[in-house]
A protein has these predicted regions:
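Extreme N-terminal starter segment of soluble prokaryotic enzymes
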Residues: 47-51
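Extreme N-terminal basic, low-complexity initiation segments
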Residues: 1-11
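Polybasic, lysine-rich low-complexity intrinsically disordered segments
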Residues: 5-6, 29-32
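Conserved non-cysteine loop/helix-boundary elements of the Radical SAM core domain that shape
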Residues: 69-93, 97-201
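Low-complexity, intrinsically disordered Ser/Thr/Pro- and acidic-rich segments
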Residues: 23-27
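Local cysteine-cluster metal-coordination motifs and their immediate loop/turn environment
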Residues: 56-67
């Protein structure tokens, strides 16, 4: 649970542990790679490279969520800088394999400004082969989505939003400790569509 006294070192450790996931590998291939080496995974036709970045910050903790998060928003700038450095440090990890997807999850990535998220996406473009990049996703809370924020996010190259609506029933949202209500969720979807987002989940 969020705790203002949480050791920042725990935050960084969790962040770096989760920063990269390679998705799209069949279980059999993944097991083979674990027992041999990761090159076995890269040299299979079913391999797809994706980068996941975990933004661990939340304003509050939802009752159902077991993902790592904290409310130390004062650490956001330092953590984002560390993520950018980590992306560069792992430049050789994919061995030149083109990145197909980028997913920024959390936590609550929509607590970041579009320029902050754009800087991370830009670092990926600088460091990795993005010639095959098809999808850049950012998770967002409905109450964070304004017209200006969404328009700026489109400019940064984000083409998919995962909006954490969870329910359109206010009673359920209160029970889950969500910060928005059903009307805010409907408004957020409309704002995203007007900003040009066609891929919404």
């Amino acid at each position: 649970r969020p705790d203002e006294k949480k050791d920042p070192g725990d935050l960084y450790m969790s962040l770096f542990f989760h920063i990269f996931v390679i998705i799209g590998i069949r279980a059999e291939t993944a097991r083979k790679g674990m027992h041999n080496n990761r090159t076995d995974c890269f040299n299979t036709p079913d391999f797809m490279a994706g980068i996941y970045i975990h933004i661990p910050f939340c304003k509050s903790k939802c009752h159902y969520c077991d993902f790592y998060s904290c409310t130390l928003l004062a650490k956001k700038e330092a953590v984002l800088a560390a993520v950018a450095d980590e992306l560069a440090c792992r430049a050789g990890f994919l061995q030149g394999e083109p990145v197909r997807t980028v997913y920024v999850g959390g936590g609550t990535p929509s607590l970041c400004t579009p320029s902050e998220l754009g800087a991370l996406i830009g670092r990926i473009r600088d460091v990795y082969d993005v010639s095959g990049l098809q999808e850049v996703t950012v998770e967002a809370n409905p109450d964070d989505l304004t017209a200006d924020w969404l328009t700026a996010l489109r400019v940064e190259g984000v083409n998919r939003l995962s909006i954490g609506i969870q329910s359109f029933i206010d009673r359920d949202l209160r029970w889950m400790h969500r910060r928005h209500d059903a009307a805010s969720a409907v408004r957020a979807v409309g704002e995203a569509q007007r900003a040009g987002f066609e891929n919404l989940t």
